[in-house]
From Swiss-Prot:
The gene coding this protein: trpB
Pathway the protein takes part in: Amino-acid biosynthesis; L-tryptophan biosynthesis; L-tryptophan from chorismate: step 5/5
Cited PANTHER family: TRYPTOPHAN SYNTHASE (PTHR48077:SF3), TRYPTOPHAN SYNTHASE-RELATED (PTHR48077)
Top-level class of the enzyme under EC nomenclature: lyase
Chain positions found as N6-(pyridoxal phosphate)lysine: K84
Family: Belongs to the TrpB family.
Molecular functions per Gene Ontology: tryptophan synthase activity
Gene3D superfamilies from the UniProt entry: 3.40.50.1100
Organism placement in taxonomy: Bacteria, Pseudomonadati, Chlamydiota, Chlamydiia, Chlamydiales
NCBIfam families in the cross-refs: trpB (TIGR00263)
Species of the source: Chlamydia trachomatis serovar D (strain ATCC VR-885 / DSM 19411 / UW-3/Cx)
Quaternary structure (record): Tetramer of two alpha and two beta chains.
Enzyme Commission (EC) number: 4.2.1.20
Annotated InterPro entries: Trp_synth_b_CS (IPR006653), Trp_synth_beta (IPR006654), Trp_synth_beta/beta-like (IPR023026), TrpB-like_PALP (IPR001926), TrpB-like_PALP_sf (IPR036052)
Name of protein: Tryptophan synthase beta chain
Length: 392
């Protein structure tokens, strides 16, 4: 068992996974400072993925919500359409350096699956993606993209047929194939060293934001807002601003149909600490410790636990965590789309929804940056099926 700097995290694993996770931790400690690895990754991110991504001021949207200055970090413009590629390219390159020939991954919204399939195609690795059956149904465009890219997509029909079940299947695969397989975990959670690995690869977001906002405004922002499922886009977005206590960090969970309905994915609102998928963090569970089913219109937020870094920042008060309902996220989706011509992912729309709710109370001179973690193309079939009255 690895020690963690706080009570959250750790590596709570069956015996068959202890050796591969210990080997990965040892190799990662070497590679994360190896200049040849870092230089190759930087080159790929710049020349293949399209970094850096823009920081866009959205004046029409700010006026529409009676808000302060609002900027979007445009991870939707990264190759494949979301922040997930930062981590997928990093981990698949890591896999090659470790001599692996096959990569397995889990996916909810499909963006991590597409990113992993893309990275594997680029780097010449075999790819298998596990995806909950209900997510396969609501994210068909991404399923087809993965298959086009050469990945095998396995529909998981166990449990609630969601992201947690896909993670279970991916871990079972890795347990028996780790000699030639790397498990490319898509969020900043799981057993150590995965939260550290994913944070490392996603922190490129906040490094760029810090440089970009200083070039525009000459200072750090007042508020950063990001959606939070597992927490990778948020921790990458927050990372370089955590040392500055004047920057307010806000994570927005999937409120689903509302807390009282019981159909949501708000871990900080109603969960309590527990062990799940090999790590200790906030978890939606019943009185007997059984993991509860979750609901969110956004597949990427539909997960019962959350990354250990976010659990620590919640308890320390360094970050504030709230929620947005499905309906609030949909309204924010259309507000941005119609005022700026930018179609956000439903995940990112939760962050926008919280900004909409607080904007009128904020001083007009403040600077708020929202991480637009992905684009909404993948969500259009689902949105089209819903009641058009919500935006007419």
């Amino acid at each position: 068992m690895f020690k963690h700097k706080h009570p959250f995290g750790g590596a709570f694993l069956p015996e068959e996974l202890l050796a591969p996770i210990q080997n990965l931790k040892a190799e990662w400690e070497i590679l994360k400072t190896q200049q040849s690895f870092l230089s190759e990754l930087d080159c790929i991110l710049k020349n293949y993925a399209g970094r850096q991504t823009p920081l866009t001021e959205v004046k029409n949207f700010a006026r529409a919500i009676d808000g302060p200055r609002v900027f979007l970090k445009r991870e939707d413009l990264l190759h494949t359409g979301a922040h997930k590629l930062n981590n997928a390219l990093g981990q698949c390159l890591l896999a090659k350096y470790l001599g692996k020939t096959r990569v397995v991954a889990e996916t909810g919204a499909g963006q991590h699956g597409v990113a992993t399939a893309t990275a594997c195609a680029y780097l010449g690795l075999d790819c298998v993606v596990y995806m909950g059956a209900k997510d396969v149904e609501r994210q068909k465009p991404n399923v087809e993209k993965m298959r086009f890219l050469g990945a095998e997509v396995v529909s998981v029909t166990k449990g609630s047929c969601g992201l947690k079940d896909a993670v279970n299947q991916a871990l079972q695969d890795w347990a028996t194939t780790h000699s030639f397989t790397h498990y490319c975990l898509g969020s900043a959670l799981g057993p150590l060293p995965y939260p550290d690995i994913v944070r490392f690869f996603q922190s490129v977001i906040s490094a760029e934001v810090k440089e970009q906002i200083h070039a525009v405004a000459g200072r750090d922002p007042d508020i950063l807002i990001a959606c939070i499922g597992g927490g990778s886009n948020a921790i990458g977005f927050f990372h370089h601003f955590i040392p500055n206590p004047k920057v307010q960090l806000i994570g927005v969970e999937g409120g689903g149909l509302g807390i009282s309905s019981g159909k949501h994915a708000a871990r900080f609102a109603t969960g309590r600490p527990g062990v799940f998928h090999g790590f200790y963090s906030y978890l939606l569970q019943d009185d007997d410790g059984q993991v509860l089913q979750t609901h969110s219109i956004s597949a990427g937020l539909d997960y019962p636990s959350v990354g250990p870094d976010h659990a620590e920042m919640h308890e320390s008060g360094r970050a504030f965590y709230t929620l947005a309902t499905d309906e609030e996220a949909l309204r924010a989706f259309f507000l941005l789309t119609r005022n700026e011509g930018i179609i956000p992912a439903l995940e990112s729309s939760h962050a926008l929804a919280h900004l909409v709710s607080i904007a009128p109370s904020l001083p007009k001179e403040q600077i708020v940056i929202v991480n637009l973690s992905g684009r909404g193309d993948k969500d259009l079939p689902q949105i089209i099926r819903r009641n058009r009255g919500i935006y007419e």
